[in-house]
């Protein structure tokens, strides 16, 4: 008699046809809420409609239904992203000078937008070189296209159509997985399978396929382009893929196929999988062979990582076990219960993901200039400045979002009854110590960092330069940063024996890469000026963290309002009869944190913009003499507040202020308009609700007098709505002002 172990039952992970597809609800604004569905009595209705349309928690408390809505919405988001990408590639195919740029990227600027003459705005079509007139773009798409081996506008056109097909596919998937085959809650909570697919599938196979594309398509095509071959003469991508002999002419080891791989003779492949470090002197970008090698290595790591977790086969790690075993001598119950939090609260999950993705985005910003990945990116100063600024802003917003969703988790999803002595509970119990210490750190950093500048301004004003903190008087050298630079500069051949150059030219070591007479990158000197501004960075970051963390830790209760959790995530004040309890909701902390995030990022991008123009970017003569854009004035000018105002903001604003009548004039208009949007925000931030309600009532009286009063009763914005409108315009105005200021300046001088 044979006893078989019972076969594991196949789990049914989807519900078929859970929700009927119908367009009826499209005609009922607010169908997700009983109150809003009744239609507008007052103008507050439209604000509530927008506030709650995507707040799925408020539509239903069923976690499975919420999960399905979020999942379906993600496909909609992907569809929009594909549509956007398609538009970018279509502009490259239809309106750009990509092929001309490809033939001479050092003298021709990238342009993919030509303005139509309607009221004379064709003045915006500046001469970007090579006889093409259009708007200079600074997104870095041309450089990415070249790195990926695109040689013609037809290829861009085909890719654009492909992206449209994918956009349609994503829309279909969003409908299908909500209306036809909607996943069950168990599927959303199966974290090990999710890790398997995301690590091994998305990151592992994704990196592997990119590495394959780079080796078989990008490398050979870029090899030809670098040698000056006309793009039209270069074989097409599929010819390299199908014909191994073509590749073997460029990389002889290709003739041996996969034999070296299976015989472990991997060094044969070092022709196209290199470990050089530094930059390619022809293009000023990282060696594409280094990049291919990197993606292959990343693919291996993630393919292994994706197979470490226990799925259908009963071997590997279980995440719950890992978390519950994670206890130290001083951490009580450790991470016990964290698994349940992260599988039942999407806000908790999103908060962690936003915090990590935000930090990663800021890391990307710093690597885009110090290790420029694409050919001819480093010498395109406008694109370099734009990419840095863009990734810094995005990172800042994501990190504030992390705090927002952490606070929503605390208010809506945290259950204090079954949490005792785990790490989260312990943090909450000593939150006063955390916040008061952080507050002390902010005060210390603020007074000392700003105090150094004030000292310098005072000494400068009194004509005592010998008593200033500067590289030529009282030095405050950033010795730790210089030590890190030196360590990295000395690494090749020592701690990184296989490398021929250090990871980034910025570390030091004396070499300089210039392309077409422009500096791509050189060692960046750090001195007293950097020491001062870095402490301003420390100050602004700590204040941002103080505000956001206080919002999270006191989201449910505080000494002032012990029952805060029952008031919800956003509320203006703790009801009538309790003065001094306004601006305490978790939402208000996010609101206030946004302003400090804006401060923090502004100082960073100003520092970057000036430092690069002063000490890195510039032209190089035949004799090897480098002339920087602002002639190295950062070290002596940025050590006073007056210097920042006079030699950075005012001096460099001249291009945007004087742009009228030139192809940069749109930036002049944006500069003006965005200042106006910013100023408009102050009207919402500085006045109270009652002022506007009073005004509205006079206006309604006038309408009644003329018998033109609307049926929907006008109401002033609620306090929270007013703040939301205020902060939105403040940030939008500030960011657009900075954008116009930076681009007009760098396109004119770079």
From Swiss-Prot:
Chlorophyll a binds at residues 683, 691. This is Photosystem I P700 chlorophyll a apoprotein A1. GO terms for molecular function: 4 iron, 4 sulfur cluster binding; chlorophyll binding; electron transfer activity; magnesium ion binding; oxidoreductase activity. It comes from Aethionema grandiflorum. P700 is a chlorophyll a/chlorophyll a' dimer, A0 is one or more chlorophyll a, A1 is one or both phylloquinones and FX is a shared 4Fe-4S iron-sulfur center. It is found in: Plastid, Chloroplast thylakoid membrane. The lineage of its organism: Eukaryota, Viridiplantae, Streptophyta, Embryophyta, Tracheophyta. GO terms for biological process: photosynthesis. It comes from the Eukaryota. Phylloquinone binds at residue 692. The gene is psaA. Chlorophyll a' binds at residue 675.
């Amino acid at each position: 008699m044979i006893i078989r172990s019972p076969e594991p039952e196949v789990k049914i992970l989807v519900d078929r046809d859970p929700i009927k597809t119908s367009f009826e609800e499209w005609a009922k604004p607010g169908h997700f809420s009983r109150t809003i569905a009744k239609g507008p009595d007052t103008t507050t209705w439209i604000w509530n409609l927008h506030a709650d349309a995507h707040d799925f928690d408020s539509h239903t408390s069923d976690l499975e239904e919420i999960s399905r809505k979020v999942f379906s919405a993600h496909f909609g988001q992907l569809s929009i992203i594909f549509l956007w990408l398609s538009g970018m590639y279509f502009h490259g195919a239809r309106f750009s000078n990509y092929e001309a740029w490809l033939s001479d990227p050092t003298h021709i600027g990238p342009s993919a937008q030509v303005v139509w003459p309607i009221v004379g705005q064709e003045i915006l079509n500046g001469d970007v070189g090579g006889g093409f007139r259009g708007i200079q773009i600074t997104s870095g798409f041309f450089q990415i296209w070249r790195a990926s081996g695109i040689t013609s506008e037809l290829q861009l056109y085909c890719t654009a159509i492909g992206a449209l097909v994918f956009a349609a596919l994503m829309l279909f998937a969003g409908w299908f997985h909500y209306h036809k085959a909607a996943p069950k809650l168990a599927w959303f909570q199966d974290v090990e399978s999710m890790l398997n697919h995301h690590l091994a599938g998305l990151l592992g196979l994704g990196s592997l396929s990119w590495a394959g594309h780079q080796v078989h398509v990008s490398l050979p095509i870029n090899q030809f382009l670098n040698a000056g071959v006309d793009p039209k003469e270069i074989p097409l991508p599929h010819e390299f893929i199908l014909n191994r002999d073509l590749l073997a002419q460029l990389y002889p080891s290709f003739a041996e196929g996969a034999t070296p791989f299976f015989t472990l003779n991997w060094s044969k492949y070092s022709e196209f999988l290199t470990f050089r470090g530094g930059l390619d002197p022809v293009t000023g970008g990282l060696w594409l062979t280094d990049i291919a090698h990197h993606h292959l290595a990343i693919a291996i790591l993630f393919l292994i990582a994706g197979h470490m977790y226990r799925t259908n086969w009963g071997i590997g790690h279980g995440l719950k076990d890992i978390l519950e075993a994670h206890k130290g001598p001083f951490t009580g119950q450790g991470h016990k219960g964290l698994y349940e939090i992260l599988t039942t609260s999407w806000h908790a999950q999103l908060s962690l993901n936003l915090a990590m993705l935000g930090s990663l985005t800021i890391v990307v910003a710093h690597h885009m200039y110090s290790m420029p990945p694409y050919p001819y990116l480093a010498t395109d100063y406008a694109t370099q400045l734009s990419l840095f600024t863009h990734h810094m802003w995005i990172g800042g917003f994501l990190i504030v979002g992390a705090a927002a969703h952490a606070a929503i988790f605390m208010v809506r999803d945290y259950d204090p009854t079954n949490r005792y002595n785990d790490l989260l509970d312990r943090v909450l119990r000593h939150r006063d110590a955390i916040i008061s210490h952080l507050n002390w750190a902010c005060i210390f950093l603020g007074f000392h960092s700003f105090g150094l500048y004030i000292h310098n301004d005072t000494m400068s004003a009194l004509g005592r330069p010998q008593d200033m903190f500067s590289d030529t008087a009282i030095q405050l050298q950033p010795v730790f940063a210089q030590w890190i630079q030196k360590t990295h500069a000395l690494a090749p051949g020592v701690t990184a024996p296989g490398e021929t150059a250090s990871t980034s030219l910025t570390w030091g070591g004396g070499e300089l890469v210039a392309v077409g007479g422009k500096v791509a990158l050189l060692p960046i000197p750090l001195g007293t000026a950097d020491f001062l501004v870095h402490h301003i960075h420390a100050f602004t970051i700590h204040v941002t963290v103080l505000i956001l963390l206080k919002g999270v830790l006191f989201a449910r209760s505080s000494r002032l309002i012990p029952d805060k959790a029952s008031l919800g995530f956003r509320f203006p004040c703790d009801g009538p009869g309790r003065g001094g309890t306004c601006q305490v909701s978790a939402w208000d902390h996010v609101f206030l944190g946004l302003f400090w995030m804006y401060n923090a990022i502004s100082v960073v991008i100003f520092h970057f913009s000036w430092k690069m123009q002063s000490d890195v970017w510039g032209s190089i003569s035949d004799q090897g003499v480098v002339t920087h854009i602002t002639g190295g004035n950062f070290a002596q000018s940025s050590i006073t507040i007056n210097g920042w105002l006079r030699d950075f903001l005012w001096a460099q604003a001249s291009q945007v202020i004087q742009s009228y009548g030139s192809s940069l004039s749109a930036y002049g208009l944006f500069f003006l308009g965005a200042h106006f949007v910013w100023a408009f925000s102050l009207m919402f931030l500085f006045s109270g609700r009652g002022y506007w309600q009073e005004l509205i009532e006079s206006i309604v009286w006038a309408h009644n007098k003329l018998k033109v009063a609307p049926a929907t009763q006008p109401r002033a914005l609620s306090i929270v709505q007013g703040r939301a409108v205020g902060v939105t315009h403040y940030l939008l105005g500030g960011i657009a002002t900075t954008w116009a200021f930076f681009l007009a300046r760098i396109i004119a001088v770079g």
